[in-house]
């Protein structure tokens, strides 16, 4: 039976991916911090096994992942968080919290597992389309996602000689407990079910980058191609800033 390891599996996209893979006869190792939520997943799906640890703690991450007797070929690094600064007011403590999860949390998992990677290994890194262009108050979140997107792409280059695949995922707005906290309009908001289907299909067909919803993400990618002054003018217009 196929196996997948998913971090951030206790809610949102990660939870939906865990449920959908389990429903398609995969063995799922669901990783997260909240043991109660992980227990709920295990109780609903016999093919889900939980693994509780904090991705921001390298020793906790290494200890937990060392318990795996066999490394799944598919590894989905999905754990993430989001916080926004007050307009133009830098809060380094907030930046550290966001980067500790969105960047170092992913790096901790890779460091803990990389010695066991094989030519069958496929690493999927969940970033965000927020990395495409600057957005108001998203200094910490957008920068963390831009960082992990860059890391993902360079890893894809550096690991290709070992036949280790790396896929980057850039979702738009997905309805999750994180986005439920947003105090602004979220155009083309999609469900976790939609996100899971797009991610799983993209993985299955071997895409190097998965982004959705396509109209929204292509719109952002197009803006990113504009000359700087024009790009900033367009962003100001569409965000009302």
PLM regions: where:
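Residue(s) in the substrate-gating loop at a strand-loop-helix junction
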Residues: 128
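Rossmann-fold cofactor-recognition segment
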Residues: 45-59
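Active-site helix of classical SDR
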Residues: 110, 144
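C-terminal helical subdomain
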Residues: 168, 184-219
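Conserved glycine-rich Rossmann-like NAD(P)H-binding loop of the short-chain dehydrogenase/reductase
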Residues: 24-40
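Conserved glycine-rich cofactor-binding loop
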Residues: 10-11
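Substrate-binding pocket helix/loop in short-chain dehydrogenase/reductase
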Residues: 86-99
């Amino acid at each position: 039976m196929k196996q997948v390891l998913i971090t951030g599996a206790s809610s949102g996209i990660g939870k939906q991916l865990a449920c959908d893979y389990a429903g398609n006869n995969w063995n799922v190792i669901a990783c997260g911090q909240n043991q109660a939520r992980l227990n709920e997943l295990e109780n609903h799906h016999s093919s889900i096994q939980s693994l509780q640890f904090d991705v921001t703690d390298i020793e906790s991450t290494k200890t937990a992942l060392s318990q795996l007797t066999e490394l799944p070929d598919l590894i989905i690094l999905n754990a993430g968080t989001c916080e926004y600064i007050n307009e133009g007011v830098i809060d380094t403590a907030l930046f550290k919290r966001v980067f500790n999860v969105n960047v170092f949390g992913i790096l901790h998992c890779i460091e803990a597992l990389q010695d066991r990677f094989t030519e069958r290994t496929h690493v999927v890194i969940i970033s965000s389309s927020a990395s495409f262009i600057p957005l108001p108050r998203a200094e910490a979140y957008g920068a963390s996602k831009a960082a992990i997107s860059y890391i993902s792409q360079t890893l894809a280059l550096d690991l290709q000689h070992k036949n280790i695949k790396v896929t980057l995922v850039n979702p738009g707005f997905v309805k999750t407990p994180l986005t439920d906290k947003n105090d602004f309009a979220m155009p083309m908001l999609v469900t976790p079910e939609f996100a899971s289907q797009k991610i799983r299909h993209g993985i299955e067909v071997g895409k190097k980058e998965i982004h959705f919803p396509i109209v929204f993400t292509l719109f952002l990618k197009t803006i990113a191609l504009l000359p700087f002054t024009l790009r900033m003018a367009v962003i100001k217009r569409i965000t009302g800033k």
